[in-house]
């Protein structure tokens, strides 16, 4: 009863996200035969809140347990509990609540020595309990310690190092991504040093972690991660060979050699196009890509810094799109996630357009919009500034929305102006949020404040277009002058194409429709107008079922 009462008092006073972890110094021992992980080490935490803090929260995967926590070489006072959260593949965390001797002032730090251990088998609990099919869940949550392959990603997959975060729930489309995003933002300046010992390793197995490309396991190997926002701590133990390409080191399982060759060719194929569209912005130092093969053919890819974990047995299209994303990331460095993540997605869509068609590219865009639509629907009344592309911590949301923003920007200003602006971009000069807007305006000679206000600096949701009226008037000499009025029921303004279907051919005019407003456009029809359509798929909107209007001419 005393422990329960103590825990209740602690939990009521907890601010789980008050602290950032500024440094980890960990010793890891992995026993693949037992799927076991043992960790001893030191961590430094800083109070980043505005108030003194008496309690510190430490969380690890629920398949691990706390063995010891010390402060100043003395056992710390702490209690433990299971904390439900989907930031770990088990759907839960083993949480230790540490009582400090006295409240820690804002910006002050505390050093803790910790010990924890347990097993890490593959676990799909968090996914299957929300209805994800078992096979799909295994392809997503493939992390595990085993004799044949060991792969552990960090927060968001397996919490194998201590964190402190509010709960995330997979039933909420944005909960996990937002929680992980807030954590990563707090860890932007953090550093982790880890010594990894792998028991009973074969002669062919190697360790991949941090900046280590291919370390033997005959003795403990040192791993280093800096900037835990961009470089999520992970490690892989696997028997892999190396294919050193011009721009990437590709590590592959011996049976996947042909896939490694295919990926090397894919990188070579896409790099010239990326250079044309985005320019060359890499520093030339530390930007060489690294690819690590996964043994599961449908495993979900993962990226950390310049490293990609992915199955090299994927189909040709998937390999090409991964190569586009990787090349875009390495060749366009920006401190702003909406720029870097968005341009990676934009480059993929642009490549599909180049190799296939505009229709195929827009179909690809539309097929990936459902999550964006769901995310916007789930946040009515949220703070438009905090949910904006420049402030949101939800990486998936930022990537998805920013991809569409870049596609719309190309539609607005044209490829020539957009390409010139991107070539002129300098990351070191990007000191304020409006820098990119000014670059594009300088090349396009258009005022884009309305667009950036609604799509980048604030989240106004998505537009929702419908045609409210069409008036066709016969003109001398034949044909019709058709006036189309479109209404935007949503909050975000957009320049949208209005298509007039005729008995012989189509005509297209673009129209800017502000949020919660109407606008009209006149189109000269050379033959009988049949149907008016607003939006060809280039603009994301919340409802596309009301975009067509059948024209009835008065005879």
Give the label of every model feature segment.
Residues 64-135, 140-141, 180-186, 517-527, ...:
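A surface-exposed beta-strand-loop module
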Residues 68-70, 205-209, 472-535:
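Beta-strand-rich binding/interaction modules
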Residues 113-232:
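Extended, low-hydrophobicity, Ser/Thr/Pro/Gly-biased non-transmembrane segments
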Residues 239-339, 343, 347, 351, ...:
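Juxtacatalytic substrate-recognition/specificity segment
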Residues 337-413:
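Acidic/His/Gly-enriched intrinsically disordered linker/tail segments
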């Amino acid at each position: 009863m005393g422990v329960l009462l103590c825990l209740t008092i602690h939990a009521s006073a907890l601010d789980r996200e008050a602290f950032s972890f500024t440094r980890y110094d960990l010793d890891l021992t992995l026993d693949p035969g037992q799927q076991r992980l043992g960790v001893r080490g030191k961590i430094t935490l800083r109070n980043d809140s505005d108030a003194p803090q008496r309690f510190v929260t430490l969380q690890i995967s629920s398949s691990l347990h706390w063995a010891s926590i010390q402060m100043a070489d003395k056992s710390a006072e702490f209690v433990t509990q299971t904390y439900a959260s989907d930031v770990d593949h088990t759907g839960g965390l083993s949480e230790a609540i540490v009582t400090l001797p006295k409240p820690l002032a804002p910006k002050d730090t505390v050093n803790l020595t910790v010990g924890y251990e347990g097993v890490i088998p593959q676990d799909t609990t968090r996914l299957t309990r929300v209805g994800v099919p078992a096979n799909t869940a295994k392809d997503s949550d493939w992390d595990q310690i085993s004799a044949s392959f060991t792969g552990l990603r960090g927060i968001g997959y397996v919490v194998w190092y201590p964190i402190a975060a509010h709960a995330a729930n997979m039933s909420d489309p944005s909960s996990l991504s937002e929680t992980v995003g807030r954590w990563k933002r707090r860890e932007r300046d953090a550093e982790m040093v880890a010594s990894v010992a792998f028991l009973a390793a074969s002669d062919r197995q190697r360790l991949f972690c941090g900046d280590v490309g291919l370390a033997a396991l005959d003795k403990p190997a040192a791993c280093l991660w800096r900037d835990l926002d961009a470089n999520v701590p992970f490690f892989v133990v696997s028997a892999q060979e190396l294919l050193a390409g011009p721009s990437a080191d590709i590590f592959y399982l011996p049976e996947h050699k042909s896939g490694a060759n295919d990926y090397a060719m894919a990188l070579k194929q896409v790099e010239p196009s990326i250079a044309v569209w985005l320019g060359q912005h890499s520093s030339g130092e530390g930007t060489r890509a690294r690819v690590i093969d996964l043994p599961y053919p449908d495993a979900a890819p993962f990226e950390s810094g310049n490293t990609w974990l992915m199955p090299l047995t994927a189909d040709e299209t998937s390999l090409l799109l991964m190569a586009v994303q990787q090349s875009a990331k390495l060749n366009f460095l920006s401190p702003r996630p909406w720029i870097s993540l968005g341009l990676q997605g934009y480059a993929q869509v642009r490549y599909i357009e180049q190799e296939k068609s505009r229709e195929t590219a827009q179909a690809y865009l539309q097929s990936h919009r459902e999550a964006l639509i769901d995310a916007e629907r789930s946040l009515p009344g949220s703070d438009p500034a905090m949910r904006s592309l420049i402030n949101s911590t939800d990486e998936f949301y930022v990537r998805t929305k920013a991809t569409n923003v870049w596609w719309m920007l190309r539609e607005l200003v044209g490829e020539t102006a957009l390409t010139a602006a991107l070539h002129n971009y300098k990351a070191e000069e990007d000191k304020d949020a409006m820098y990119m807007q000014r670059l594009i305006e300088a090349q396009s000679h258009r005022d884009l404040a309305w667009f950036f206000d609604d799509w980048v600096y604030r989240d106004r949701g998505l537009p929702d277009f419908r045609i409210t009226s069409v008036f066709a008037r016969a003109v001398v000499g034949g044909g019709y002058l058709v006036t189309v009025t479109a209404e935007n029921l949503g909050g975000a303004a957009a320049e949208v194409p209005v298509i007039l279907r005729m008995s012989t051919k189509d005509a297209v005019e673009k129209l800017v429709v502000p949020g919660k407003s109407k606008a009209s456009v006149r189109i000269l029809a050379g033959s009988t107008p049949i149907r008016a359509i607003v939006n060809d798929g280039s603009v994301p909107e919340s409802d596309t079922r009301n975009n067509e209007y059948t024209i009835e001419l008065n005879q």
